[in-house]
């Protein structure tokens, strides 16, 4: 090993140790526990090796199937909304006008607020008695109200609204970074050729910010798959499991029912899906960069 490589490795070593302790070890431990039958509320039953039994039970569990459908619905709904809204916000923030810096700072406030705090805020907003949602919807008439957090149809939508409000600014920040790498000369040349604003956006802007969009898509898909804190604070998976996503279902199995092995199997499933999607997105991102590389 050359001295420069050795020095680089020494600089990386503390980070590698940190990641190993706080990321790789929990993943390994979850894999290990998923092959055991261990119920914390029934300790006299012991810690029994059951092989793939937790995974076969998970495959036939109707609640797990419902949680999977809820998670998929959450992902396929929030991601397009976040990308669309984030792209629009980035295009506005990329324009030159007075107060642009202040606008960028304000836009990032939802992302900067801790998720637990913003979840509690949205829980108050959607409260059926004193929430702002009912006040605006019914013009302050306290005798009329909706209870969106207690409605199996509306409750998932409240989670989606809270998620998009918080994470669209993050997407906007990534896309804005991509927009600022596009040379102005390309737009000037397109204008000289008679391209309209839409044509410039379609043939100049979109192709050049594709890597930024893919990166935002990767981050947001992984984050949406493991959504937990919004559900924990706002609905606790209810009503009637309408917002019971996989991460929260695994949490309930471990900490409410004491089924450590089964809950670990759920966690492993979420991790593997996230890993596969990450590898697919990274391959697409790599292909996109190779297409842009001059030959």
Report each predicted region and the residues it spans.
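A structural signal for multi-pass alpha-helical bundles of membrane permease subunits
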Residues: 4-295
């Amino acid at each position: 090993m050359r001295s420069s490589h050795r020095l680089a490795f020494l600089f990386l070593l503390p980070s590698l140790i940190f990641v190993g302790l706080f990321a790789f070890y929990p993943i390994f431990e979850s894999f290990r526990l998923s092959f055991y039958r261990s119920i914390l509320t029934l300790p006299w039953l012991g810690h029994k090796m059951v092989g793939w039994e937790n995974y076969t039970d998970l495959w036939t569990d109707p609640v797990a199937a419902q949680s999977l459908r809820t998670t998929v619905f959450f992902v396929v709904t929030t991601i397009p909304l976040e990308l669309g809204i984030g792209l629009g916000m980035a295009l506005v923030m990329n324009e030159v006008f007075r107060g642009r810096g202040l606008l960028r700072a304000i836009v990032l406030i939802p992302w900067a607020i801790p998720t637990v705090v913003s979840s509690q805020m949205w829980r108050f907003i959607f409260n059926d008695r004193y929430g702002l949602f009912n006040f605006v919807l019914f013009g302050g008439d306290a005798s009329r109200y909706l209870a969106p957090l207690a409605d199996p149809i509306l409750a998932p939508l409240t989670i989606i609204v809270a998620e998009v409000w918080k994470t669209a600014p993050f997407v906007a920040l990534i896309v804005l970074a991509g927009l600022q790498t596009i040379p102005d000369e390309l737009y000037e040349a397109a204008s000289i050729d008679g391209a309209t604003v839409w044509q410039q956006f379609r043939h100049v802007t979109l192709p050049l910010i594709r890597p930024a969009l893919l990166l935002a898509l990767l981050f947001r898909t992984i984050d949406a798959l493991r959504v937990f804190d919004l559900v924990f604070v706002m609905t606790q998976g209810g009503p009637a499991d309408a917002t019971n996503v996989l991460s929260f279902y695994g949490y309930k199995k471990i900490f409410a029912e004491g089924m450590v092995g089964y809950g670990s199997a759920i966690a492993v499933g979420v991790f593997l899906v996230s890993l596969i999607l990450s590898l697919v997105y990274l391959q697409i991102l790599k292909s996109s960069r190779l297409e842009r590389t001059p030959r």
